[in-house]
Amino acid sequence: MKNKHPLSKDELQLFRESVVDAKKLRQDTIVHRKPKPKTKQIAPQRLLQEQVDASHYFSDEYQPQLEEEGPTRYVRPGYSAFELKKLRRGDYSPELFLDLHGLTQMQAKQELGALIAACRREHVHCACVMHGHGKHILKQQTPLWLAQHPDVLVFHQAPKEWGGTAAILLLVELAE
């Protein structure tokens, strides 16, 4: 393959002489994330089963003890409260997002179950659930459901850039 603009030896020598004192710039502004492993296509029936299995944990009768004052937050018993602080101050950024606007409670439970299953399957540690304000039904129920799931380690009301009082950031326990 021929070069479109071949340089003569004199031109190459002139270029090398002109850049001999150049210093390499240090790149410190862009964070390179690790490439995600390619995920296999999953059969729709298996996805549906994952949704059903994961939503099995969500009960409307059980009311976990959540703090009523301040922002919505939860730390699984036996887990470090420092992770909650790191989540609150933005050390984690969500990689998966779920928007529950316009869904019924049953649909929302299934979608939450699917989100948690997807996080575990794709090795995503942090996710964001946008429940919205609306009639406050999903806003009240979402934290109660999340606190019941054994794979949810921590959740906290999202900062403004991720939805504020209309969203929750959560950390999911990953399979080894």
Swiss-Prot record:
Domain Smr per the UniProt entry, residue ranges: 98-173
Entries under PROSITE patterns matching the protein: SMR (PS50828)
EC number: 3.1.-.-
Keywords recorded for this protein, A-Z: Endonuclease, Hydrolase, Nuclease, RNA-binding, rRNA-binding
InterPro entries: Smr_dom, Smr_dom_sf, SmrB-like
GO molecular function terms listed in the Swiss-Prot or TrEMBL record: RNA endonuclease activity; rRNA binding
Entry-linked Pfam families: Smr (PF01713)
GO biological process, one term: rescue of stalled ribosome
Superkingdom per UniProt: Bacteria
Membership in a protein family: Belongs to the SmrB family.
Function: Acts as a ribosome collision sensor. Detects stalled/collided disomes (pairs of ribosomes where the leading ribosome is stalled and a second ribosome has collided with it) and endonucleolytically cleaves mRNA at the 5' boundary of the stalled ribosome. Stalled/collided disomes form a new interface (primarily via the 30S subunits) that binds SmrB. Cleaved mRNA becomes available for tmRNA ligation, leading to ribosomal subunit dissociation and rescue of stalled ribosomes.
Assembly information from the UniProt record: Associates with collided ribosomes, but not with correctly translating polysomes.
Name this protein carries in UniProt: Ribosome rescue factor SmrB
The species this protein was found in: Serratia proteamaculans (strain 568)
Organism ancestry: Bacteria, Pseudomonadati, Pseudomonadota, Gammaproteobacteria, Enterobacterales
Gene that this polypeptide is encoded by: smrB
